[in-house]
UniProtKB/Swiss-Prot annotation:
BP GO annotations: cell wall organization; peptidoglycan biosynthetic process; regulation of cell shape
Domain of life: Bacteria
Name by which UniProt lists this protein: Glutamate racemase
Residue pairs linked by disulfide bridges in the UniProt entry: none
Keywords annotated in UniProt: Cell shape, Cell wall biogenesis/degradation, Isomerase, Peptidoglycan synthesis
Pfam families linked: Asp_Glu_race
Enzyme Commission no: 5.1.1.3
GO MF, one annotated term: glutamate racemase activity
PROSITE patterns listed in its UniProt record: ASP_GLU_RACEMASE_1, ASP_GLU_RACEMASE_2
Membrane-traversing stretches: none
The species this protein was found in: Corynebacterium diphtheriae (strain ATCC 700971 / NCTC 13129 / Biotype gravis)
Length: 265
């Protein structure tokens, strides 16, 4: 047993979609969540900069005694997963592979779409993993403005629906029946994206599959928290903690009672 916290980070509030499921499925686990809103969005940034930011946050999480790091950000996963695993002695999990597994098992016609930030799509991380399933045809589309909409609290309305329809038009033309939400911000746009794609397309998020990987890894290494432990959940932002708390309510509701200013970078 190990009652040390799980460290989770993202470029902003999007990773809370992953944190929420982890906390629901592993109710005894303590969590330290860091949202790097001061540097959001990660998508347009050079890979080297995203890697540097990710390593800095990872250093701080390890310094605080986290037993595991979850990169709850697709862009950071594609840019820095390997580097964090090489740098730190704790397990480090990303969110891309879980989404790929889920999509492959979900598709009916073998045509899968992936939407994400510019950084994630350009990295080819999803395409590389899908290549292990030769019967699958992958169509990737960058949606660069989605993260900024979410970070401003805009998750519905004609403006964002129009933007979404423009983004997904090539995916509709390709006949995809399964769409991977390749950014942890995107689940908050599920209604808009589903409306733009149509009811016949299944949307896939990595949150639940990532939580399963967390449980499996902690179980195999005997690092699950004890059943009588009282979890402590800490949420921090590199930007404005008040704004972060307001946006976080959309993801976690009453789970977020206090957001602190992160000063580790």
């Amino acid at each position: 047993m190990n009652n040390a916290p799980i460290g989770i980070f993202d470029s902003g509030v999007g990773g809370l979609t992953v944190a929420r499921v982890i906390m629901e499925q592993l109710p005894n686990e303590s969590v330290i969540y860091i949202g790097d809103t001061a540097n959001s969005p990660y998508g347009p940034k050079p890979i080297a900069q995203v890697r540097e930011l990710s390593l800095a946050i990872g250093e701080e999480l390890v310094r605080r005694g986290c037993k595991m790091i979850v990169i709850a950000c697709n862009t950071a996963t594609s840019a820095a997963l390997r580097d964090l695993r090489e740098r730190f002695d704790v397990p480090v999990l990303g969110v891309i592979l879980p989404a790929v597994r889920r999509a492959v098992s979900t598709t009916r016609n073998g045509k899968i779409g992936v939407i994400g930030t510019e950084g994630t799509i350009k990295s080819g991380a999803y395409q590389e993993l899908f290549a292990a399933s030769p019967s699958v045809e992958v169509h990737a589309q960058a949606c660069p403005s989605f993260v900024s909409f979410v970070e401003r609290g805009i998750t519905s309305g004609r403006q964002i629906l129009g933007v979404a329809q423009g983004y997904v038009e090539p995916l509709q033309a390709a006949g995809v029946d399964t769409l991977v939400l390749g950014c942890t911000h995107y689940p908050l746009l599920t209604g808009v994206i589903q409306l733009a794609m149509g009811d016949r397309v299944t949307l896939v998020s990595s949150a639940e599959e990532t939580a399963k990987d967390v449980f499996k890894t902690l179980s195999m290494t005997d690092m699950l928290a004890s059943e009588d432990s009282t979890p402590v959940r800490t949420f921090e932002s590199t930007g404005d903690p008040v704004l972060f708390a307001q946006l976080a309510e959309r993801f976690l509701g009453p789970h977020v009672t206090n957001v602190e200013k992160f000063a580790g970078m």
